[in-house]
Amino acid sequence: SNLEFLGFPGIYIDDEFTQGIEIQQVLTPQVRSQALKVVHDMFAFDVDSDAEEDMPVSEIKIQKTIERIVENILSNGDIMCNVLDIKNYDDYIYYHSINVAMMSVLLGANYGMNEESLYQLTTAAILHDIGKRFLDIGIINADHALTEEETQLLRKHPELGADYLKGNYHFSTLVYAGVMQHHENYDGTGYPL
């Protein structure tokens, strides 16, 4: 926590085991900052307010952020992914969303996805937990085992997120499916379906 107080998200250990490993940032500080702001604003707006500052983030702003993330990562070539950005628990959801987006671009590019598919994948990745904004913060940040009722509420976040996005944005069906199904497993287990 002293490092965090001083503004350092983490440190690298330089010893005989790390010789020859070059650590590169996956995103530039500017792109990371923009992405965090967009994700924060997506979670922070007031659903019941008509005030302009409480309106959802514009689709254009989200798309520009996604483009910058994808282009920033693709321009770095082969990089060793550094995902040290899980800060404190209160900010976890924002950093988690960015980390999932970064990993999605890296995996999608590795599998040979075209740029348009990477944009859709990254949009779904960065917004995958948006449904959590409709849940009680006590459930999201619980420091105890959730009750059965709390677990059932938490398991609704993919559907809440997909419904919210469908009602407020014009993303592709693949983006909505990615948000809706991000806790589904190949064997049919998982949720919400």
Where are these regions (language model features)?
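His/Asp/Glu-rich acidic catalytic environments and adjacent acidic regulatory segments
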Residues: S1-D14
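Acidic/His-rich, divalent-metal-binding segments that scaffold phosphate/diphosphate chemistry
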Residues: T18-R155, E159-M180
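Glycine-rich beta-alpha junction loops
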Residues: H183
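Acidic loop->beta-strand submotif enriched in PP2C/PPM serine/threonine phosphatases
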Residues: Y191-L193
